[in-house]
């Protein structure tokens, strides 16, 4: 029996020695990210969309963000910027934009820009209660963006309260 145990121990030691450092690896060790992975490809396309969006070429940006999301649906920033690009093209896109703002926030609940621009969308549609709720969340995430959203909400309230009045003389 002792000979049998020694033989098993020797065999196990030989296997470890032959396998080298790989035998000591742990399952949770990080794996290298392969080039051309879906997320990596999506980010390249997304970055192209950002350039187009900054140039105010919203239909072209929309197409790039949609392509990025087709490659990797889990990119919250692409959902946010797709929603922005849709919103900037007119009210006929507001429902679709809202779905993408909501998805961005599902994926990344602390994405301040999505609260900011969804709040603007709510303001544009007259839903000041939901715009104010997004403003309250922004106060915890990004006070500068919260101030910008507050200005949008206030300007809407002031505009609505003064409809039909003549402009003030300077």
Positions of predicted regions on the chain:
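TPR alpha-solenoid repeat register
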Residues: 78, 114, 147-148
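Alpha-helical segment of the N-proximal tetratricopeptide repeat
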Residues: 40-67, 71
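Canonical tetratricopeptide repeat
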Residues: 47, 81, 117, 151-152
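Structural signature of tandem alpha-helical TPR/SEL1-like repeats
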Residues: 55-67, 89-103, 125-137, 161-165
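Terminal, low-structured helical/coil segments at or just beyond the last alpha-helical repeat
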Residues: 26-36, 132-170
């Amino acid at each position: 029996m002792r000979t049998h145990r020694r033989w098993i121990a020797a065999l196990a030691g030989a296997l470890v020695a032959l396998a080298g450092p790989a035998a000591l690896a742990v399952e949770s060790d990080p794996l290298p990210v392969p080039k051309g992975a879906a997320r990596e490809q999506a980010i390249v396309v997304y970055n192209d969309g950002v350039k187009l969006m900054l140039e105010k070429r919203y239909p072209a940006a929309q197409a790039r963000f949609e392509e990025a999301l087709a490659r990797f649906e889990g990119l919250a920033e692409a959902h946010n910027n797709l929603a922005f690009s849709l919103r900037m093209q007119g009210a006929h896109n507001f429902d679709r934009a809202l779905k993408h703002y909501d998805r961005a926030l599902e994926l990344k609940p602390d994405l301040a820009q999505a609260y900011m621009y969804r709040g603007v969308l709510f303001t544009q549609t007259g839903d000041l209660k939901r715009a104010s709720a997004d403003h309250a969340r922004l106060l915890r995430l990004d006070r500068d963006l919260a101030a910008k959203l507050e200005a949008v909400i206030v300007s809407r309230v002031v505009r609505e309260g003064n409809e039909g009045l003549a402009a003030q003389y300077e």
